Amino acid sequence: MVRRTSAGWLFLMLRAYRNWDFPKGVVNPGEEPLAAARREVREETLIDNLQFTWGEEYRETEPYSHNKVARYYLGETRTECVSLPVSPELGRPEHNESRWMDLAGVLAVASPRVAPIVRWAAEKIGIPDKPA
């Protein structure tokens, strides 16, 4: 998820323990993947005004942690303030922190699994790739 500011594009990163990632989650039975992406963003951040300015193209990670594959869409929002609501299943927020970051900041904290997704998103929105 990205947000355009007067200083340029920012990416929303969420931290769970020491790991930074984008909003993500499980596709429920009968749910379309893009609808699941919208729902997960809303559940994890309360942001409900996503626009898919660059279409429904997505990127997936390489398999990780028990062969999971995360699918990421590039959504845009104008929302600056992010809330981390309590998950009914966990009894606490799913994430410890949220932060809007520029490309260099994201690449500095992104795991090797997430970094290719960041670079793809940066290319889609027209940010030149910068080494971390």
Descriptions of predicted regions:
Residues 1-3, 74-76, 102:
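Short, well-ordered beta-strand micro-motif
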Residues 58-86, 99, 121-128:
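Active-site-adjacent beta-strand/loop module that shapes the phosphate/pyrophosphate-binding cleft
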Residues 16-18, 69-71, 94:
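Residues that flank catalytic or metal-binding motifs in active/ligand-binding sites
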Residues 27, 77, 106:
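Hydrophobic pocket-lining residues within nucleotide cofactor-binding pockets
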Residues 1-23:
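N-terminal strand-loop-strand
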Residues 84-121:
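NUDIX/MutT-family hydrolases
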Residues 18-20, 43, 80:
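Glycine-centered loop/turn positions within well-structured domains
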Residues 22-56:
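The catalytic Nudix box helix
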